[in-house]
Each structure stands twice: as structure tokens, then as C-alpha cells.
């Protein structure tokens, strides 16, 4: 098991900084070890990583950007929502369920248009139905980030070490 190199004050950081600092350490570790598939990460660490990808993409450009950037399958076809529910996180998974239905309808089209060079603002105009869930996500994330940080703090060893015990 490998202890991550983390800032001394990491456990005192505000919730989003705590989450993003951990995921940054995971990605740095996997880059250094050549583990491009992130296979050394535990299920909980994968969940946290997926959440941070979700959060960064949706906060920047909504679900359309998440899909156009190629993260749709990673977020919607993996058990992220169910894993968050197991952590007692409720608001974000509800939004993910609604956005997933739109992804199933429009995901391939958005990905194809993005691969063809369409920019995010024009894609957002073409798929305005995602806007409602973008707004719902912003509210849900604000509510759930402290709960995520609390879960991480309560299970610190699970998140601060990589590899098998």
C-alpha cells in the first residue's frame, strides 16, 4: 500500500479543495507508475475521481460539455450515482439519473458533433434541455460537497493510500 504525498493541512481544506487535492494525487501517482487505466485505485477512489471529473466539467460548461469532452460514458455508464448513494449522498445522484436519460437520447449526437469540431456554446444552444439539470446540479453539488468531504474524512485510510493492504 502506498501512502500518497499530500499537503499537511489537507484535512482542514474546504470540501472541494479536499476532493480535488486527493484526485490530483491519484492522477499524479498513476502517471508516475504508468497506470493509465487507473487500475491501482480502489472502487471508492474511482468514485471520487469520477465525481471530480463530473464536477469540473459540469461546473465549467454543463452536462453538454461533459458529454462533448468524452466523459459521458465514464459518468453515465458506470455506477457513480449508486456509489454516491452508498455514501449517503442523495442530491447529485438524483440529478445524474435525470441527466442520464438525456444522455441516452442525445449523447451520441453530441459526441459526434463535438468530434466534428462543434464548440460547446453552439452545442449548448442545440441541446437546451440539459440546462435545467445543469442548474439542478449546481444546487445539488453545493449541498453534497460537504457530505462528500465528511465521508472521506470518516474513511480517511481508504482515500489516502493507494494499492492493496
UniProtKB/Swiss-Prot annotation:
The record's listing under Gene3D superfamilies reads: 1.20.1420.60
| Highest taxon above the source species | Bacteria
Q: Which Pfam families match?
A: DMP19 (PF14300)
Q: How is its activity regulated?
A: Activity can be modulated in vitro by crown ethers, which are small cyclic polyethers that can modify protein surface behavior dramatically by stabilizing either intra- or intermolecular interactions, thereby probably altering the protein's tertiary and quaternary structure.
What does the UniProt entry state concerning the protein's domains?
A: The dimer exhibits a double-stranded DNA-like negative charge distribution on its surface, which facilitates interaction with DNA-binding proteins.
Function of the protein: Acts as a DNA mimic. Interacts with DNA-binding proteins and prevents their binding to DNA by occupying the DNA binding sites on the proteins, acting as a competitive inhibitor. DMP19 is a bifunctional DNA mimic protein involved in controlling nucleoid formation as well as gene regulation. This bifunctionality depends on different oligomeric states. The monomeric form interacts with the DNA-binding protein HU, which prevents HU from binding to DNA and forming nucleoids.
Q: How does it assemble?
A: Monomer. Homodimer. The monomeric form of DMP19 interacts with the DNA-binding protein HU homodimer with 1:1 stoichiometry. The dimeric form of DMP19 interacts with the Neisseria hypothetical transcription factor (NHTF) dimer.
Write out the similarity annotation: Belongs to the DMP19-like protein family.
What is the official name of this protein in its record?
A: DNA mimic protein DMP19
What is the species of this protein? Neisseria meningitidis serogroup B (strain ATCC BAA-335 / MC58)
Amino acid at each position: 500500500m502506498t501512502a500518497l504525498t499530500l499537503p499537511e493541512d489537507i484535512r482542514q481544506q474546504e470540501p472541494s479543495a479536499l476532493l480535488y487535492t486527493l484526485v490530483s494525487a491519484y492522477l499524479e501517482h498513476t502517471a508516475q507508475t504508468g497506470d493509465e487505466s487507473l487500475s491501482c485505485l480502489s472502487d471508492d477512489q474511482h468514485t471520487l475521481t469520477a465525481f471530480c471529473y463530473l464536477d469540473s466539467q459540469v461546473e465549467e460548461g454543463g452536462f453538454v460539455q461533459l458529454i462533448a469532452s468524452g466523459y459521458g460514458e465514464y459518468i453515465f455508464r458506470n455506477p457513480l450515482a449508486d456509489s454516491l448513494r452508498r455514501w449517503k449522498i442523495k442530491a447529485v445522484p438524483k440529478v445524474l439519473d435525470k441527466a442520464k436519460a438525456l444522455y441516452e437520447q442525445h449523447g451520441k449526437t453530441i459526441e459526434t458533433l463535438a468530434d466534428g469540431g462543434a464548440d460547446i456554446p453552439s452545442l449548448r444552444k442545440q441541446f437546451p434541455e440539459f440546462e435545467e439539470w445543469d442548474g439542478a446540479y449546481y444546487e445539488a453539488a453545493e449541498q453534497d460537497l460537504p457530505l462528500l468531504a465528511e465521508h472521506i474524512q470518516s474513511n480517511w485510510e481508504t482515500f489516502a493510500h493507494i494499492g492493496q493492504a
